[in-house]
Amino acid sequence: VGVLVVNAATVPTRRDESWRYSDLEAVASVWPVPAAELIEVAAGEHVSRVVVQDAAIDAVAIRDFRVVLHKGATATFHVLNTGGKLGRVAIDVTCHEGSHFELGGAMLGGGDQTLEIVTTLNHIEPNATSNQVVRSVLSGRATGSYLGKVAVSRDAQKTDASQSVKAMLLTRTATANAKPELEIYADDVKCAHGATVGELDAMALFYLASRGIAPAEAKVLLLQAFVAGAFAEIADEAERATVEAAALAALERMLDMSLPQETRASPKTPLPLAGGAGGGPVL
């Protein structure tokens, strides 16, 4: 029997706010984690990143990013978090004057998975904006957590920051945690956040069934529509197709685990990820 020995002083605990919902035993098994990847965007430039976290189901996958946006710079992140016993993506962003950060993220998990998206937006100069859209679909005993802090300094007047967080629970044993947080020291800002947790709309399922669509396939279609808002802005068609295929595969796996073999759906072509952040008639 192996014994795991770690430096307890360095491993996160429940007292660490950004780790409060995490699988700390899994974290300890890979601690210390690599340093955050630094992405520095020069004034007026743009960076776009697509992160697909689909590690093996027994893996521990922790990815950290540190983003610095100089004057007028923009960055767009799209995150699909589906893999691992623990799958965690953390992004720390510093926004200088007139910069913009955009996040579209989704967590799709089942079984005993713990999935996390953790963000910190530091607005330190005026006229910067940020927008975050996160969607979760959870089944089994999975836990999906979004922790997003927006910190606005005294000099960051005219900040405009928003967070939209929605979760869909396919089983009553799944857990969704949402903790949008605002820390504002400026007096001329616009900051908004919203978080909801729900289930598939029975009326929407009934409507699709009345059109001859099998129940399992109907669920996949509705769930695809639900997560669509997180990825609608991916400009590169190849990247969008990659994320779309990975999301569809994750949704089908989740539903397959809870359905008899004869009722399982196998859509041949994923829906295009289009639509507004509301994600269709499912919440």
Where do the PLM segments sit?
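N-terminal cationic leader/targeting segments used for protein routing and processing
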Residues: 269-270
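Glycine-biased, low-complexity coil/linker segments
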Residues: 263-265, 274-277
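Positively charged, low-complexity intrinsically disordered regions
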Residues: 21, 50, 262-265
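Divalent metal-cofactor coordination and adjacent catalytic microenvironments
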Residues: 17
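Conserved beta-strand/loop scaffold segments within soluble protein domains that form the structured core
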Residues: 4, 8, 12-14, 23-213, ...
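Intrinsic disorder at enzyme termini
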Residues: 1-4, 254-259, 263, 283
